[in-house]
Structures are given as C-alpha cells and as structure tokens.
C-alpha cells in the first residue's frame, strides 16, 4: 500500500492539484500564506481563492467545536477563532466586490424562526455548537426571548389604548351638570373644614372674618334641560321685531291709519320695557353697591386682623425702604474699591 508522500508524487495527483489552483479552489501551496490585509490583493482570482480557503477553515472548526471532549476554555477559543474567520471572510467579500466580482453578501439572508422573528445571536458576535451551552450564554438567549415577549405585550397594550375617545379618559365629565353640582358641594364642605381649622389655629372666633366659598362653577354653566334651538329663537325674536318695525314705515298710504295705531301700541310697549329695564338696572346697582360695601368691610376687618398679628413690628419697619440714587450707589462702590485696594497693599 502506497504512503501519502508517494501518492503526492504521482502524476495524476499533481495534475489535479495544479488544476484546482488554476481554478481558484485548490489547496494552499507549500509556503504560501494568506495576506493579512484583504485590500493588498489586486487579483480577483486570488481573492476568490483566499475566500474559499477561509470557508474551509470555518467548516473544519465548526465541526471541531461539536466535540464533547473539549473543555469550556477550548470551546471559547474555537468560537473566537470562528468569529475572527467570519470577519476575514466579510473583508475578502468586500474586496471581491471592489475588484468587480460577485456579491456574495447578497445571498446571506436573515435567520428567522417559525413566527418570522429574527433569531437572536445572528448579528455581531455569534455562538456555534457547544458554545451556546456555555455558562452565561444560555441565559443570554433566554433573556433575549423574554425581552421579545415583553415588547410584544407592551405593543399590544399600546394598541389597546390607542383609538379610545375622550369619554374613556374622562374629558367629557365637565358636561355633566349633576356631577359638577356634586363636586361643588364636596368642594364647599372641604373649604369650610379647612377654614375652621385655620381659624382655630390662628385663634379667630368671629365667623364674619372668615373667607367665604367662591362662586360655584355650575351656576355659570347653561341649563342642560333648555333646548339650544329655543335659546336661538329667543335671541332672534327682538331682531325680527326690529325688522318688522322698520318695514311698517315703508307701507302704502291707504294703510296709514292702521299703521299709526300699531305704532302707538308698539311705542307704549317699548316705554314699558324701558321702565322695567331701568327698574332692574337700579336693583342691580343697589345689589352691587351692597356687595361692594360688604367686601370693603371684609377687607377692613382682614386688615385689622393682620395688624393684630403684626403687632410685634413697628410702623417704620413696615414702610417701603428708600432706594439709593445713582450717585449714592457710585460713591458706595468707590469706597468698597478703595477699601479692597488698601487691604491688597497692606495700607490701613
């Protein structure tokens, strides 16, 4: 039986080896080393040959990393070498594209699972064979799966609350008059409780000095039971009457007597309406004056109460301080600078 060295000297073996080298897929020649920089290679055939050489090294080391007899340190070293070979392969593929060759990176797709999601660990640093079972790596894959599940749940909850109307978020509660009345009652009770607590703390026994609850919001809102069309008709009624009065002045002469009677009745109605308006305005003015007097008395009482609390201060301390003029301020700054120069040079 012939030895390997004798087989290597045969004519057929040398012919096949030279043929593979010429095609760019042959084995590495004796003493021939792969260039460290892919950009240093200017031949497309040589670049194809070195890429094939890297693929054979990757295949051999991926098969070797499956060995159960290897230790964890050897598995880590082999996995690092495989990732380094993948980086070199990418560099040679870029050089092949620059030299006008085929684009091998176009055929490399993204690995996905049954649900169409990208498999973790397919980008950047990869783990092969037994490297996926190393301590710390298995937890990394489990964590990425849990993170994807949490992101899908977060997206589902976002879609659930995405197309909800303003009623869902309580933006239409202010249109409910009953709810506003209830809130006003509770706010009034809370106001009165806090006022009593503050009065007991400050030692105020007179209830007339206590601040009253502000005007409720519900009193400013229109009544929901009244139809808005009815309100519009009431607003348009005086405009129609004015137009009718203007139109009566342009009637024919034969209806002059009837028009005079109608105008007389309308004038009487207008005078009565003016009287009622003046009466209501007088009443409103009297009520407003009474409210102003009450507010003035309340302010005076509050000022008296504040003066009682501030009895420890004299009148001069409560006055507004007198501000220095521009010249006085310049003199003060000049004195400060002189004092600083004296301290700097030791002159006292």
UniProtKB/Swiss-Prot annotation:
Q: Where is the composition biased (Basic and acidic residues)?
A: 264-278
Query: What is the top-level taxon of the source organism?
Result: Eukaryota
A cellular-component GO term for this protein: cytoplasm
Q: Which GO terms describe its biological process?
A: generation of catalytic spliceosome for second transesterification step; mRNA 3'-splice site recognition
Matching entries from InterPro entries are given as:
Helix_hairpin_bin_sf (IPR029012), Isy1 (IPR009360), Isy1_sf (IPR037200)
Instruction: Report keywords, A-Z.
Output: Cytoplasm, mRNA processing, mRNA splicing, Nucleus, Spliceosome
User: Mostly located where?
Assistant: cytoplasm
- Chain residue ranges for the region called Disordered: 220-282
Compartments reported by the entry: Cytoplasm; Nucleus
Give the function comment from the record: Involved in pre-mRNA splicing.
By its UniProt entry, which PANTHER family does this protein fall under? PRE-MRNA-SPLICING FACTOR ISY1 (PTHR13021)
Subunit text = Associated with the spliceosome.
Family classification: Belongs to the ISY1 family.
**Designated name of the protein:** Pre-mRNA-splicing factor ISY1
Q: Which gene encodes it?
A: ISY1
